[in-house]
Regions:
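N-terminal export/assembly segments and adjacent metallocofactor-ligating motifs
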Residues: 2-28, 34-242
Length: 242
């Protein structure tokens, strides 16, 4: 009805967002130089756009030791912003969720119940939906920065999932496999269904011969990944092969 919402140009909105980001960063460590999520971290982007050069927070930050919550997933609770996305996704994908939010208030943390291991066939999707580096892929840990890799659309025949993924390559070697995401960072819908990946496709098939590679993934030209002389951007659609 003629309503105009200025969500980017309004100084008031920008200042309010800065306040929210400051709260999110209150307990967040400066791990960007060593975090595998650097370069594709939503909080890193928000901090760069709205954050202050220094914090006003003087109290001691919460600290946790990194733990393995499965044989493929590392949890860095120091980086967690308690968005609960991993919990919601686990509820969708399994009836036997073994992790969640423990305690309340400032003592709340993500962990497994009675230190059980997360081992369902789709647990790797929790890594994809984590907006920060709280959940990371142990098979990719510290191997490369994302801006050194080339994301390629690929697929394979799989009886557990859709088999459609993004393989991150350096030369002819696949360093990691992730679900396909849209421009908002959400896992894409393919054929009317969310394109979750099974753990077999994600962790066990990292040879180029395991996949039918269609071509470069379309990315935003402002992404740090595009700085690695990556030609395909959102403004220049990719020409499919086959």
């Amino acid at each position: 009805d003629g309503m105009v919402v200025n969500n980017k140009t309004s100084e008031r909105v920008h200042n309010n967002r800065g306040g929210v980001v400051e709260f999110l960063l209150a307990n967040h460590p400066l791990d960007c130089p060593i975090c595998d999520q650097a370069g594709e971290c939503h909080l890193q982007d928000l901090g760069y756009e709205h954050g202050s050069a220094k914090t006003r927070y003087e109290e001691e930050r919460r600290t946790f030791d990194p733990i393995d919550i499965g044989n493929k997933i590392k949890l860095h609770m120091n980086r967690c912003i308690l968005c609960y996305r991993c919990v919601f996704v686990a509820n969708q994908l399994t009836e036997n969720r073994v992790h969640g939010v423990l305690h309340r208030g400032e003592h709340a943390e993500i962990s497994t119940f009675i230190e059980q291991a997360v081992d369902n066939d789709f647990s790797g999707n929790m890594i994809d939906v984590c907006p920060v580096g709280a959940l990371t892929d142990r098979t990719f840990r510290f191997k490369s920065r994302v801006w050194f890799l080339k994301p390629m659309e690929a697929e394979r025949s799989c009886n557990k999932c859709c088999g459609k993924a993004v393989v991150w390559m350096f030369g002819n070697e696949i360093y990691r496999v992730t679900a396909r995401k849209d421009k908002y960072g959400e896992v894409e819908d393919i054929d009317g269904k969310t394109a979750w990946l099974c753990n077999d496709c994600r962790f066990e098939h990292k040879s180029a011969t395991d996949w039918n590679i269609a071509g470069p993934r379309v990315i935003n030209r402002h992404s740090v990944i595009s700085q690695g002389k990556y030609a395909t951007s959102m403004e220049k659609p990719v020409k499919r092969i086959g």
